[in-house]
Swiss-Prot record:
Keywords: ATP-binding, Cell inner membrane, Cell membrane, Membrane, Nucleotide-binding, Sugar transport, Translocase, Transport
Described function: Part of the ABC transporter complex UgpBAEC involved in sn-glycerol-3-phosphate (G3P) import. Responsible for energy coupling to the transport system.
Reaction equation(s) it catalyzes: sn-glycerol 3-phosphate(out) + ATP + H2O = sn-glycerol 3-phosphate(in) + ADP + phosphate + H(+)
Domain called ABC transporter: residue spans: 4-235
Binding site for ATP: 37-44
Entry's EC annotation: 7.6.2.10
A GO term for molecular function: ATP binding
Top-tier EC class: translocase
Keyword presence, Acetylation: no
Topology in membrane: Peripheral membrane protein
CDD domains: ABC_MalK_N (cd03301)
Gene designation per UniProt: ugpC
Keyword Kinase attached: no
Protein name stated in the entry: sn-glycerol-3-phosphate import ATP-binding protein UgpC
Gene source species: Escherichia coli O157:H7
Amino acid sequence: MAGLKLQAVTKSWDGKTQVIKPLTLDVADGEFIVMVGPSGCGKSTLLRMVAGLERVTEGDICINDQRVTEMEPKDRGIAMVFQNYALYPHMSVEENMAWGLKIRGMGKQQIAERVKEAARILELDGLLKRRPRELSGGQRQRVAMGRAIVRDPAVFLFDEPLSNLDAKLRVQMRLELQQLHRRLKTTSLYVTHDQVEAMTLAQRVMVMNGGVAEQIGTPVEVYEKPASLFVASFIGSPAMNLLTGRVNNEGTHFELDGGIALPLNGGYRQYAGRKMTLGIRPEHIALSSQAEGGVPLVMDTLEILGADNLAHGRWGEQKLVVRLAHQERPTAGSTLWLHLPENQLHLFDGETGQRV
């Protein structure tokens, strides 16, 4: 068991352009951290820096309070699971799982014990003599995980391990990963572009954008209190509604085009007259009526999802999505009267994009 610390680490490809801006992260012993963000945000590069596969330009990486910044990957006490299973096709499941231990010179008896225990944990007991071609995608990924488990690492590193699986199998493997972490309690750093994976697997999420950690927090914190416009737009499906407008002179209402004024929860007089962005999750918008002071929205389209529905409409040039109960099925062109609860509104600075 070990903690992991990244202390102001940076990465530059040409010595000038930083692809990882100074980033600090403290992962507690046994904690499961998920790095999530769009392609090119730097999450896989950062993971490879922790693994020792990419050189750290500046800063330090420590595992179990030991500085490993210049240490060879094999000496860091890490095990990595990749998107591609990278199994040897001519070897059995048992041989694939044992191979890394053999080349390290571990004794046969100890190897056999470790492989047997990993196979038991991953329910691969009956598959040990099979070759990779005889396995399903999920079974191959289990073998790849088993190969990492037998090493008994201080830290697990996962680089989008579920990306090659179909949707149904990804759900199953997410559950298995959760159960595996509860059993092993090994410090883990996991990379994905899939926010569902991030929200369901993580104890804490690090949302990355352009080489910067936009926000680090629990899945609930990141969802309920996004620190920036980027986090608000990236986390959530569908994404948070983001509406541009201005805070009125009294700081009590948010004014949109078309004379719509939404009451704000608390005083925002210091932002009076400033261009801001207001956010609200689709599920936090309630149906109301004209008599109750509801705000009108002309509906463009309706997505029927089964458990619920998504109504898409516009206020002028600004789009709005409302999550409705499954029995609510308004037709295109109809007017919905909406209530936007003050305590569910998020306000972001129009210039910096940061939460206020």
